[in-house]
UniProtKB/Swiss-Prot annotation:
Effect of gene knockout: Seedling lethality.
A Pfam cross-reference name: mTERF
Role: Transcription termination factor required for processing and steady-state levels of plastid transcripts. Required for splicing of the chloroplastic group II intron. Required for the accumulation of 16S and 23S ribosomes.
Transit peptide residue numbers: 1-54
Protein's name in the database: Transcription termination factor MTERF4, chloroplastic
Organism name: Zea mays
Family: Belongs to the mTERF family.
GO biological processes: developmental process; DNA-templated transcription termination; regulation of DNA-templated transcription; ribosome biogenesis; RNA splicing
Example of a GO cellular component annotation carried by this entry: chloroplast stroma
Length: 494
């Protein structure tokens, strides 16, 4: 029976699932249908507002919010600049710090360097420099070169653009150029302190052409470093507009180019005397006061500073002094200037002191006038040395005062180095000679004369009538050590 049931061709149907199982099957079917169905349209009415997404810590501000924030910060920075006296409009378009604190740091740092609010107002772009990226590297480089801290304020006022410079690209090549021109490393910082604008020059520009021109007219190549050290402004002078016209004008009054080169080597600052403002008017003033045109070149060679003085009024006052105190006529005053142009700068007290000394020695004022015209150096010598010369003349040489009137340059010779040895040699030989024959010659010429047994009258007269300036060339340096005339370059350096 059992066996027939198990293998029957028509088995009985299975039992239906339990209720819980049926529900589970229905849920799975519904889920599958919703996944395969297209999304439903939003059934909300058009007037129903959409929900705002929930805020998050990682949400980004909109571009509009960022622009508003940036404008607010810039307004704060502009207000701070205004409080410093700086016009914010001067910095329009420049990328500035986003906070007042950073801008305040820059202002305080520049203030620590010695710059004032007025300086910042004059060059507000300095506030556009980063302290760490721009200022510190530049200042550190200048300090290593030897630029003094107390010189920084003036350097930055004159050339604040250095704060924007690159040490490698802008500054180091200029320093290397200076050293290549034989400017000593110890002099480089002084050059930069005096002429900081040099740091902005390009090597292939004005610097090279000005040096080349100076060498071309005869300035020694080895003297270029000294010229630059004492007058670095020459590197910024254009040849065609400044240097060449200056040289050509001096050539026009009779100076040779090589002589001009020697003047530039000794006193390079003369190149800074404006041709139209100083040089030409001063040359005209000398001619107007009585100097002969053929003597102008000699005057400039002796006293190049005359080209840069406030000359016309000074000449009028000095001519009046000489006329009233020494009885020197206007024409003779011109001869005085030709022989010693430094007489222009002699003070009234110095002139009167020397005149009083000579009159105290027994000379009449008319004789003093003649002596000064023949040898203006009398007014510049040290009084004590003049006194020693006069006492030796009176006590040892026992000559007449008229000989000093005829040869006043006697006072310019050293007693021990020249006068005493020669006087004793002449005395031993029993020769009688004039002061000019005794002194107005070189040592070699005098030794040759000592071979003479007699002195020809013609030779004596020739020496007596010789140019007094020849004797002045023999002046010993000791005569001028404590002179009342001081010739200092500093007075004329610009």
């Amino acid at each position: 029976m059992m066996k027939s049931l198990l293998f029957s061709a028509h088995p009985t149907s299975l039992l239906l699932p339990a209720p819980r199982l049926r529900r589970l099957l229905r849920l799975r079917a519904a889920s599958s249908a919703s996944a395969s169905a297209p999304p439903r349209a939003d059934r909300r009415s058009p007037g129903t507002p959409s929900r705002r997404p929930s805020s998050s810590l990682y949400a980004r501000p909109s571009l509009l919010d960022m622009e508003r924030d940036r404008a607010t910060r810039r307004a704060d920075v502009d207000a701070f600049l205004t409080s410093l006296g700086v016009d914010p409009g001067e910095l329009a378009g420049l990328e500035l710090p986003v906070t007042v604190d950073v801008m305040r740091e820059r202002a305080e740092f520049l203030g620590s360097l010695g710059l004032t609010q007025e300086d910042l107002a004059a060059y507000p772009l300095a506030l556009g420099c980063s302290v760490r990226k721009n200022m510190v590297p530049v200042l550190d480089y200048l300090g290593k070169l030897g630029v003094r801290r107390d010189a920084l304020p003036d350097l930055l006022r004159r050339y604040p653009q250095v704060l924007h410079a690159s040490v490698v690209v802008d500054l180091a090549p200029v320093v290397k150029y200076l050293q290549g021109m034989d400017v000593r490393p110890t002099d480089v910082p002084r050059v930069l302190e005096r002429y900081p604008e040099l740091l902005g020059f390009k090597l292939e520009g004005t610097m090279s052409t000005s040096v080349a021109y100076l060498v071309g007219i005869g300035v020694g190549r080895r003297q270029v470093g000294s010229v630059i050290t004492r007058f670095p402004e020459v590197l910024g002078m254009r040849v065609g507009k400044i240097i060449k016209p200056f040289v050509e004008h001096l050539e026009g009054i009779g100076l040779q180019r090589l002589a001009i080169a020697r003047i530039i080597e000794k006193k390079p600052y003369v190149l800074g005397f404006g041709l139209q403002e100083k040089v030409k008017p001063n040359i005209e003033a000398l001619v107007d006061i009585g100097v002969r045109k053929e003597a102008l070149a000699s005057i400039v060679m002796q006293y190049p500073d005359v080209l840069g003085l406030e000359l016309r009024d000074k000449l009028v006052a000095q001519q009046s002094l000489f006329e009233s105190s020494i009885l020197v006529s206007r024409e003779d005053f011109g001869r005085v200037l030709e022989r010693m142009p430094q007489a222009i700068s002699l003070g009234r007290a110095a002139v009167l002191k020397h005149v009083n000394f000579l009159t105290a020695c027994g000379f009449m004022l008319s004789q003093v006038s003649k002596m000064v015209v023949a040898c203006p150096q009398l007014l510049a010598l040290n009084i004590d040395i003049m006194r020693m010369n006069f006492e030796y003349f009176k006590n040892e040489m026992e000559r007449d005062l008229e000989e000093l009137v005829e040869f006043p340059a006697f006072f310019t010779y050293g007693i021990e180095s020249t006068v005493r040895p020669r006087h004793e040699m002449v005395s031993r030989k029993g020769l009688t000679c004039s002061l000019a024959w005794l002194l107005n010659c070189s040592d070699a010429k005098f030794d040759e004369r000592m071979k003479y047994d007699t002195i020809g009258v013609e030779e004596m007269e020739r020496e007596d009538s010789s140019d007094m300036n020849a004797s002045v060339d023999e002046v010993e340096s000791e005569e001028y050590e404590d002179s009342d005339y001081g010739d200092s370059d500093d007075e004329f350096v610009r």
